[in-house]
A protein has these predicted regions:
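A long amphipathic alpha-helix within ATP-dependent nucleotide-binding catalytic cores
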Residues: 184-241
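A short catalytic or substrate-binding loop motif that flags glycine-/basic-rich loops and adjacent residues
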Residues: 115, 151-156, 225-230
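Extended active-site and interfacial segments that coordinate phosphate-rich ligands
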Residues: 5, 172-195, 252-254, 261-270
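C-terminal active-site "lid" helix and adjoining low-complexity regulatory extension at the edge
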Residues: 200-211, 228, 240-243, 251-280
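Phosphate-binding site of ATP-dependent enzymes
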Residues: 106, 131-186, 233, 237-245
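Glycine-rich phosphate-binding loop of ATP-grasp-fold ATP-dependent ligases
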Residues: 108-135, 156-159, 181-200
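Well-ordered, non-membrane alpha-helical segments in soluble/globular domains
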Residues: 3-14, 76-80, 129-134, 204-218
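Conserved N-proximal alpha/beta basic substrate-recognition cap immediately N-terminal to
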Residues: 6-19, 24-104, 116
Length: 280
């Protein structure tokens, strides 16, 4: 069976993950690929827009997830699905409640429930601007609520990378990355042992980290297994007080997964910086 895999963006990243036997192209170029037998389509991440693009480009409906599967994934991608793992975070569906939340924490982050990679985020200190309130009202109307989180003084970002299949959710490894104002910048190519040591060195209570991992594992088994198949990355951060928090879950390929695989293939790159441009 031949295996066709393509990336919505960044075909070289997918080529690294899936090897030379895979054809990695942008979505708009799918129609240029010769299809000589059964194939699989694996984008950077699934959503209804990607599926429609593929159908227009000639992909077989049988090679794509069903509309029901896309709908289930969209529900998982709503930030409320992971609130039980996020201390202090709340789903707020009314402006007065948003004012109450800001009164409690003073420095907060607002996030649109269907957003990721630093998009759909607003930073607020002490009072809302008119633009903040307009944005929040619009998000609540369109996405049911807005997610509010206390703003932490972040000293370290890292992620745990997984692949979900039919029977289980497998842990692939850790990734260590840098952000600026919540937006990804680059990964450091460190092995899992080095990243674990770095995590522990920043924590004031390792038992709380162990407990959070146990809660995450239960959540993956109860909420993800059987509902989603594919890669996913769980982002964490540690604040200046040495406490660890879960930031978000990305149901797609991630740069952390790519960096982890790159280091596996190029162990001599240990300790260097990795970003999409690293692949040329």
């Amino acid at each position: 069976m031949s295996a066709l895999r393509f990336a919505q963006e960044g075909a070289p990243l997918m080529q690294l993950l899936y090897g030379k036997d895979a054809v990695a192209v942008a979505a708009s170029e799918f129609h240029t690929v010769p299809l000589d037998g059964p194939y699989r389509v694996i984008p950077w991440g699934w959503d209804a827009v990607v599926k429609q693009q593929l159908l227009k480009q000639g992909a077989a409906d049988s090679a794509l997830p069903s509309d029901a599967e896309i709908g289930t994934l969209r529900n998982l991608q709503h930030r409320t699905s992971v609130l039980s793992l996020q201390d202090g975070a709340e789903a707020i569906d009314a402006i007065p409640a948003l004012h109450d939340y800001l009164g409690r924490y003073h420095r907060i982050v607002l996030k649109a429930p269907w957003s990721g990679s630093g998009r759909g985020v607003r930073w607020v200190t002490d009072c809302f601007s008119q633009q903040d309130l307009y944005w929040a009202e619009k998000v609540i109307k369109e996405q049911r609520c807005v997610i509010a989180e206390p703003r932490r003084n972040v000293v370290m970002d890292f992620a745990m990378e997984y692949v979900a299949n039919v029977s289980d959710v497998q842990f692939v490894g850790y990734s260590f990355f840098k952000t600026q104002s919540g937006v990804y910048r680059y990964n450091m190519l460190w092995n899992d042992d080095r990243i674990q040591q770095e995590i522990v060195s920043h924590l004031t209570d390792v038992s709380l980290w162990n407990a959070l991992q146990e809660r995450l594992n239960r959540w993956l088994q109860q909420q993800v297994l059987g509902k989603y198949q594919g890669p996913l990355g769980v982002d964490f951060f540690i604040d200046a007080d040495g406490k660890v928090y879960l930031g978000e879950v990305n149901f797609r390929h991630t740069m952390g997964l790519v960096a982890h695989e790159y280091l596996r293939q190029h162990p001599a790159a240990e300790g260097t910086v990795f970003s999409p441009s690293s692949l040329g």
